[in-house]
Design a protein with these regions (language model features):
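Acidic (Asp/Glu) and glycine-rich low-complexity loops/linkers
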Residues: 1-100, 106-115, 125-134, 146-153, ...
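Ser/Thr/Pro-rich low-complexity tandem-repeat tracts
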Residues: 12-13, 79-80, 100-101, 119-120, ...
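Short loop/beta submotifs within extracellular cysteine-rich repeat domains
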Residues: 17, 84-85, 105, 124, ...
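Low-complexity, compositionally biased segments
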Residues: 120, 139, 166, 184, ...
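Glycine/small-residue-rich hydrophobic helix-like segments
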Residues: 155-156, 161-192
């Protein structure tokens, strides 16, 4: 399938999408009994990759779709156990990442602004270099971050986690609630808000302004937590 003009990739229903720097067309790899049910198409600037509804269960990673990076992608969406793995570096002004319902996204980016949202047991692993990063994790999802940003804004709830110990942030705002956990490395100033057994742990030479209620906690990280 020829590569068209799209700015968003939307993957769902257990498919695995591999973004590469290699030129060429979109390539679908699947067993003969599945390939006819793979749906790949562009609608309103979105490249949608899924499986026909008549297939009730898709075996894990049995469908692989290789997509050449076109330089225009600004949003990645994965849901329903789909996976997006980027083997290319995203650059530009903005990148949005959304993962839900046990989906997985892995990406590296050098952008001005990055927004990450993970929910319902999804996982995002990202190397981010940006001026501003916003990350929101909920409902047992997880976000694992590396890189460097000028300002980071984190929010985690309902047993979700954000691990940013290997992300150097100059300024950071972190809010954790309902047994969620946020771990950060901050160099200048941290504002922390916790409630309902949420926790924020921090490392780095930052000043800390915290507001903890209903069993929430803000604390400096122990040495073994920095690894």
């Amino acid at each position: 399938m020829a590569v068209g003009n799209f700015h968003t990739i939307d993957a769902s229903r257990g498919v695995k999408v591999l973004l590469t720097d290699e030129p060429g067309d979109i390539e679908i790899c699947a067993d003969d009994n599945l390939i006819e049910y793979v749906r790949v198409g562009i609608d309103g600037g979105e490249l949608k990759i899924t499986v026909a509804p008549r297939i009730h269960a898709v075996p894990s990673e049995q469908i692989l779709v290789r997509v050449p990076y076109n330089g225009n992608i600004r949003k990645l969406e994965a849901s329903s156990a789909a996976k997006i793995v980027a083997k290319t570096l995203f650059t530009g002004r903005m990148l949005e990442i959304e993962a839900s319902s046990a989906a997985r996204i892995r990406v590296d980016a050098q952008v001005e602004t990055c927004e990450i949202d993970a929910s319902s047991s999804a996982k995002v692993v990202a190397q981010i270099d940006a001026d501003r990063l916003e990350a929101d994790a909920s409902s047992a999802s997880s976000i694992l971050l590396q890189g460097a940003v000028q300002k980071a804004v984190f929010e985690a709830s309902s047993a979700a986690s954000i691990d940013a110990r290997k992300l150097v942030a100059h300024f950071c705002e972190a809010e954790a609630s309902s047994a969620a956990d946020i771990r950060v490395y901050c160099e200048q100033a941290l504002q922390s808000r916790t409630s309902s057994a949420g926790s924020v742990s921090y490392a780095g030479p930052c000043s800390v302004n915290s507001a903890d209620t209903s069993g929430g906690s803000t604390r400096g990280a122990a040495n073994n937590e920095l690894k």
